[in-house]
């Protein structure tokens, strides 16, 4: 039986979505973040050395990282879901397949870092802080976005 090790507020939500769309039977094991540190609990290290989520176990196979999990699920269970999901990826060896892989990994690797930075620098000025610091924080965050994040 496939098990999804789901950590609250993690990227495993998209794995849940795909499992449902593919109609794959699965068990859901839910983990809570530490209330103080917001880190994953140590129990996840017993599943995978990274100690993070999402992670799936499928029999003897353990797969970590959401992009790798999505690829594994499509390759292994893609035929089980809705008819229109049967061909989620183009045929292996084709240019379309290479492009699909590129965009999947670009989204997970290169793009995600910039998206997280943008989110952080957009959020900082909205957080509680002394009134005299707020304009400085806003200017610094805007400059970081303009000169570093947005050009990339």
Model-predicted segments: where are they?
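GST-like domain detector, emphasizing the conserved glutathione-binding G-site
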Residues: 1-135
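Amphipathic alpha-helical packing segments from all-alpha helical-bundle domains
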Residues: 137-152
